[in-house]
Amino acid sequence: MDRYDLFEVAAARREARALPYAGALTPVEAYQLLSEGSAVIVDVRTRPEWEFVGHVEDAPLIEWKSYGAPHPDPAFVDKLAARFPKDAAILLLCRSGVRSHHAATAAAQAGFTRVYNVLEGFEGDQDEEGRRGTLGGWRHAGLPWTQH
């Protein structure tokens, strides 16, 4: 699939799921767009997750919520806008796709026109034993990542 097809698939998911942002992509689709230089990826997890669990190489960290914080960072959208134009294709990634959904919603409400959620996130959903990394996600898909 080329980038135009991938963006169309993401938009079709937006329509099917009534998403308030440009669309949603699987980790493999997101990686293809990154590899082609058609989009940027932003990690919205907490700094401890980014440092200790691992992250997509060269993905900037802009926390949606800081570790232990009960509410999203009120400056999240401003931090995103300080790094990227509002018409950039931005892929948001969290642990399982939930926080990045909320971050994408906030970004779209602030005028970002091409913000996408990466479904399944970095680690995916929990399996029957409560573990992550076995049911989807960036790492489970075998995509490149790093850990410091």
Regions found by a protein language model. Give the residues of each.
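Rhodanese-like catalytic fold shared by cysteine-dependent sulfurtransferases
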Residues: 1-39, 47-89, 100-148
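Conserved G/P- and acidic residue-centered "switch" motifs that form tight phosphate/ATP-binding loops
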Residues: 43, 97
